[in-house]
Amino acid sequence: MDPTPQSHPILAYVLSRLPSLLPVSPSLSTPRARDIEQPSPRAPSGAAEFDLVSRMPGLRHPSVLSAMTRAVADVSSARDALRLLGPRPDHELVDSARAFLRSHAAEEAEEEEEDEKVAKSREVVRLDEAHESYGGLLREAEERLDRVYRTAMRGRDMQVVAAAHGGGGEEEAGVVDDEVVRVLRDAEEGKAVERLLLADRQLRHLPEQLGRIRGLLVLDVSRNQLKNVPDAIGGLEHLEELRLASNALVSLPDSIGLLTSLKILDVSGNKLRSLPDSISKCRSLVELDVSYNVLSYLPTGIGQEMARLEKLWVHLNKLRSLPSSVCEMRSLRLLDAHFNQLRGLPAGIGRLAALESLNLSSNFSDMRDLPASFGDLLGLRELDLSNNQIHALPDCFGRLQRLERLRLDQNPLAVPPKEVVAGGVGAVKEYMARRWRDARAEEERRGSAVAESPRVSTPKEWLVRSVSSLGSWVSDVTRYGAGQDKAAAEEEEDAYLQQNL
């Protein structure tokens, strides 16, 4: 919840110098359960602070600090309010709450139990929205402090600037590249334009008119200074390749979901905090690279419609979990999720039957085990699990007989033992295959023992058999009695006839 030196360096520095703005929360002083979506706050980094002061020496000036204090007073009050409300709910819980509210509105349920669930769902959504607003407030405060500092360094009246909360600022006008102008002109004249390569042009702005180039197949604006992508990009209905790597993007427009012909999307090396839910509508995607960003989650339904996706790079982010819909990417051959904060994999990961390369390295103390379905990844050839906290590989690991490359170093492994790991991938495969066979044999032995053991009847079965036996006995008695009556009747009839004669 608190700003960190990595995400908001100036704001974290100012708050660390103001004890009155940092009330101690009881919840932070007591142990709490490990939470995938809400990790424990980390202590400020001294190295990061030293680097910040080296770049901005004026931060030590009392007048600068005083001006900055007034500029961020709203952050303190907002944070206190959020601490009372509680931690932010995880993304999948919020999506579930929103979906329930939509269905409830459509069905107009009136049961008391449903009303209680509606209230809880609304609380989840409101809490998430409050945290989202707080995140925006932190970003605005960081920019505000930067303007206060720059103004102070120019010798202006800092009290006026702080009171205005950073109003004004120098906006940099977007300058359209000559090449873009030429291409737009050609498109207006009816000329076919299929490729637009604008990498390394120091572009800060893309014009809305770009969305009118209907025949465009490839757009490369990598390694520029773009902070946003125009909504009009959704008009490029035939676009197959979009490269936005190494810019300053903090978000992508929802209209990106209209690019249904898109096969390659590269947004690596930006400042993306989230991806739009609409990205799952890019059904033709074959390669998706969202690495080197600050993503803390992926859209809940990202895998539901990406049946053709073959390569997914999500490394060097802050992901704490992968949504279960990732398991629906049945064509996925490569998944790279190293250097995140993953605490596990979805239970259905084994459904990725086409997966050949999987990198889960360097999730450090967060990654501790593998799910039982991991042994279903029979096509896996390359696996990197190094730099984690895995103590034992599951017995089903012995099924991965196609493995050619395996890294397990920097794990506190007990199964397999270190000497086996030192023998390489072949030794590990042989050891785990033997454990798998032994586990299967033991399971079959137990199954046979259960099948051969005398079966204890349940009270219901005993009663059914008793009633059946009683019914048979009554039937026999009835037949016997009927026979006796018939014989007596015949004897009486014979005696009567003889008397008459």
From Swiss-Prot:
LRR repeats lie at residues 190-213, 214-236, 237-259, 260-282, 284-305, 306-329, 331-352, 353-376, 377-402, 404-423. A motif (GVYW) lies at residues 424-436. InterPro entries: Leu-rich_rpt, Leu-rich_rpt_typical-subtyp, LRR_dom_sf, LRR_domain-containing, LRR_R13L4/SHOC2-like. Residues 25-47, 482-501 are annotated as: Disordered. Keywords: Coiled coil, Leucine-rich repeat, Repeat. Gene3D superfamilies: Ribonuclease Inhibitor. GO terms for biological process: intracellular signal transduction. Preferentially expressed in panicles. Residues 104-147 form a coiled coil. SUPFAM superfamilies: L domain-like. It comes from the Eukaryota. Leucine-rich repeat protein that likely mediates protein interactions, possibly in the context of signal transduction. Belongs to the SHOC2 family. This is Plant intracellular Ras-group-related LRR protein 2.
